[in-house]
Amino acid sequence: MRACKLLMLLIGLDFATILVRVCEIGGQYMSFQITFNNETKTYENPVTVLDVVGKDKSIICAYVNKRVRELTYTVDKDSEIIPLTLKDRDAKPLYEASLRFLVAMAMHNIYPDLKIRFSYNVSRSIFMQILNPHVCSNGMMVRDLQEEMKRLVEADLPLVRHIVSKEEAAKIFQKDGYEDKKEILAYRPEKTAHIYDCNGYRNYMYNRMVPSTGYIAKWRVRYYHPGIIIQYPRPEANGEIPPFEDAPTFGKTLKRAHQWAKATGCDTIVGINKRIEKDGDIDFITLCEQKHNRQLCELGQMIEDGREDIRLICIAGPSSSGKTTFANRLRIELLSRGIEPIRISMDDYYLTKDEVPVDEDGKPDLEAVDALDIELFNNNMADLIAGLEVQLPKFDFKLGKRVPGRVLQVPIDQPIIIEGIHALNERMTSSIPSHQKFKIFIAPQAQVNIDDHNPLSLTDLRLLRRIVRDYQFRGASALDTIGMWPSVRKGEFKWIYGTQEGANYVFNSFSTVELSVMKKHAMPLLEAIDMDNEYFPIAERLIRMLKFFDDIPDTWIPCNSIIREFIGGSCYEDA
């Protein structure tokens, strides 16, 4: 076995492929059956997924016995293969990683001396920034990039994955000028590393990829100062490239997050680990918490400056953004300025189950805005702002209906804080004049990369938060949380993201220390997922992100930190 593994390292093949070759030589294979497109065929020898599905380039990858597999994956036992296209959610990470490889290769070919970095969150696209001093992207660069990408796609060059030792990978990356990729290898726990080769260009995108460049044909490139936007098909857009939507309010927050990360040296995982090693746990935690304190101070000042008009403070954001902790900390910030807000829960305005609209599957759509009593909420808010005494509802989740709640009368100088996924939806507060509303959108906006070509996914960050929180407070397994995540995401695209540009302020709830803290909580939950489980590839992807972070103990995380909302120990748990 040791000799076999040595052979694997020497010739760049993974262990499964070695076994396939050995079995081929020894003639040890039994016949097996593969079901594809409702047709079952018998095979005498191992085949790749590509051999089965054919050369239809709309097929990006496939489920093999419910597991997402690349098209070059070898099948050697009874299996069911279901093709995945750009319309499918599980094909998106593989296509997006392949597209980043294509862009990096094209830029290397036409501008070999330029250093580039990819990041996310501009109109659901890839943002490419030029890192070289005094070099900025422009229209000519966009044209050159498009032409080279088209040439590579038409050439249909194979992308071949190799497994090499970490030492060999470090030599390759150093030779190719990728010092950032070499540095991150020091934090990789495995003794080997993966590298993809395409016509002599070598890189790795921390994901499996398509078999050849001909599969990466759908994209759109545009100039977007100070870099370049690469748009690509999205499953929520039915496999099409969604229209570009500029988001200046949201963009300012992203730019600010990037500036902070760059200024503190925390724009890469290596930078974060080095900062922890240099400053120590307590100083680094305090540094990260101070970023939230500054934002809260800014918000408090803005609301204080407009206190004569502002009566309703609306807080919304996607799942696991830290809305509960944020709302409580904002309340304390305002109290320190002599402003005494009162909180009202939008959850108390749910309709009964038989009144809730249904989704396309005929199930109650509890995330729809029409699942709330919009008219009653508007009337109650308008009456409270007018100084009237109001009988508020209280939703009894055991009874599944509203019951009478507290009676409330709000002084004219006392703002109301409402928090919920629909808090920024104009329908919920249509009876309140715009000048009396202050809207806040909250979401984690990490501008951190594994290396220059591999940004951390903000969606995966929120999924990690939710996995840890659901296990901590609801006893849910990682499988439970991952299984319901697509439904959560669907609701976010439908109801939440369209409201973010209407916000007066976007609060970045990401704490640079959080992944170093949550690692110890999340890793055991993810590692418990069996390799044969359909959600294993997602767990594997999250582990790939977490494993590079140095651990930090929970001890010094403040009780009012947003991180505490997920790992436990928050002073606001009963608030």
Question: Which residues are covered by each model-predicted region?
Answer:
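Conserved lysine of the Walker
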Residues: 323
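Conserved NTP phosphate-binding and transfer environment spanning the P-loop NTPase/kinase superfamily
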Residues: 307, 430-575
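Conserved nucleotide-sensing/catalytic segment adjacent to the nucleotide-binding pocket
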Residues: 355-397
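Auxiliary tRNA-acceptor-end handling modules of aminoacyl-tRNA synthetases
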Residues: 73-94, 115-294, 299, 303-307
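Short beta-strand-centered segment that lines the nucleotide-binding/catalytic pocket of NTP-utilizing
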Residues: 336-354
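Hydrophobic positions on the alpha1 helix immediately C-terminal to the Walker A/P-loop
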Residues: 326, 330
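Hydrophobic anchor at the beta1->P-loop junction of P-loop NTPases
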Residues: 313-315
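Ubiquitin-like/PB1-type beta-grasp interaction modules and other compact soluble beta-rich domains
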Residues: 16-100, 104-123, 133-135, 144-148
